[in-house]
Amino acid sequence: MGRAVGIDLGTTNSCIATLEGGQPTVIVNAEGARTTPSVVAFSKSGEILVGEVAKRQAVTNVDRTISSVKRHMGTDWTVEIDGKKWTPQEISAQVLMKLKRDAEAYLGEPVTDAVITCPAYFNDAQRQATKDAGTIAGLNVLRIINEPTAAALAYGLEKGKEDERILVFDLGGGTFDVSLLEIGKDDDGFSTIQVQATNGDNHLGGDDWDQKIIDWLVGEVKNKYGVDLSKDKIALQRLKEAAEQAKKELSSSTSTSISMQYLAMTPDGTPVHLDETLTRAHFEEMTSDLLGRCRTPFNNVLRDAGIGVSDIDHVVLVGGSTRMPAVKELVKELTGGKEANQSVNPDEVVAVGAAVQSGVIKGDRKDVLLIDVTPLSLGIETKGGIMTKLIERNTAIPTKRSEVFSTAEDNQPSVLIQVYQGEREFARDNKPLGTFELTGIAPAPRGVPQIEVTFDIDANGIVHVSAKDKGTGKEQSMTITGGSGLPKDEIDRMVKEAEAHEAEDKKRKEDAETRNQAESFAYQTEKLVNDNKDKLSDDVAKEVTDKVNELKEALKGEDIEKIKSAQTELMTSAQKIGQALYAQQGAADAAGAAGAAGAGAAGSASNGSDDDVVDAEVVDDDKDNK
């Protein structure tokens, strides 16, 4: 039976954790780091690179490197590489497969089950896309849980027995969430974590702060050189990396230098060099509008929960972007001067909470109950384009609601059920989740047929909808025709492709190892022959040298089987070197032993004739001692 893990599938970085002896442990990746960049690249040879190695080569491979794909989850966005269109689910699956491989190497056993986190404000299509990514990666997705909820789960387990109200402020690389949760513990140490309200912005994160710096640098270059870098992909990638680094440095310093050589060339051939100083004050001024966008979700959460700032007991910061001093100051201002809790690692706490939830679902931990909510209202379009809500936002999940509707026209044979998610009054202003048709309605005057529409939201926050004609008993379940929901056969195809790519990568790695071993063996054998030429017969030396050359020739090609065959033949021939050297050594040892025996016999004879000398010496010693 495989292990269960918790995965924080982030915009910028991802993290994986598991339970060891009931306690959550963050798993280090193959590079020895505790987080993995959510970057996927396709090398010119077709190899798929993931993580730090993909991030490092981004400048030289801009068009084939994908980052921040989380922002495209739940959309019909695709990227074409070598004639194949890749969906956000498939790109995300590559990140998950890397995390899975590294976890299996770390744990020494298969990883089969996972709890994967997503932003609290993700809609149904985005949640389904996240779940599909896990499936494509070969994982059984136990649950999709909200990132702030996972963070509160990790934080809450370390607290005492008192009931507390926690505000989680989660600003990541691409998304922003605010959640209010109540954590209660009974005398037996059983924790109940209940989400009271959640709000957010799925297009606000550290990437936007980076973009402000990039735009400023592009403007500075344009003013100084008259060169527009906004269309130069390689220059933009270099600026992106510099902007990210500058943002990080400004969290601990009041100014930073951005220096880059040969960014581009002017029309007259002058190289474009960049050497700018960015102060924290200037950075905060240029990003003040982004900071302002954090206020509305915060205020909405307090309003929805019906509480004041004074009712918040603790504030927990999640996501690397909360390290920015301006963000910390904003949180302090919004919460009436409360200092944020610093006891959790903002980069790891979400994965830790997901690992705890995986243990709860698998039965490894029985001391916690998690009650989450749906972040957005759900409803259908009714006459006049009105959004009729069946489930209000911040309703505890799982939940199920039904309502009876009727026809708008006489003898209407079918009804089109259009499902939406959002808070606006008119359906057109909300997010369409999908459409399905209930047909075969018996002829009747308008308003007579009774059509029961049922919304069912599971523990993952994923929506299932059905409609039933109460007169005929005819029922129809929702199949997504809008949004980005992938049909099962498409997911199955992607799973097979992902497995095939993994098999290709594994074979490529094995082939590289075979080649390296063969090169090393050829070098060592050649050196052995050269070092022992005087001890080897010409026949042996020539035979081995010929086999070394055959292996070297095979290594120039791509035929791995030919390399293996040549290496095997060289190994057989190389054994003759050992035989020759050992035979020569054996002869030398035998000659040495015979010489030693002769010397011993001669020594005995001479000792017999010199007895008086030896005796005299012994007597003299005795006399000295006396």
From Swiss-Prot:
PROSITE patterns xref list: HSP70_1 (PS00297), HSP70_2 (PS00329), HSP70_3 (PS01036)
Residue numbers of Phosphothreonine PTMs: T175
SUPFAM superfamilies reported for this sequence: Actin-like ATPase domain (SSF53067), Heat shock protein 70kD (HSP70), C-terminal subdomain (SSF100934), Heat shock protein 70kD (HSP70), peptide-binding domain (SSF100920)
GO molecular function: ATP binding; ATP-dependent protein folding chaperone; unfolded protein binding
Entry-linked InterPro entries: ATPase_NBD, Chaperone_DnaK, Heat_shock_70_CS, HSP70_C_sf, HSP70_peptide-bd_sf, Hsp_70_fam
Triggers of expression: By stress conditions e.g. heat shock.
Biased segments, Basic and acidic residues type: 498-516
Keywords assigned: ATP-binding, Chaperone, Nucleotide-binding, Phosphoprotein, Stress response
Function, in words: Acts as a chaperone.
UniProt name for this protein: Chaperone protein DnaK
Organismal lineage: Bacteria, Bacillati, Actinomycetota, Actinomycetes, Bifidobacteriales
Gene: dnaK
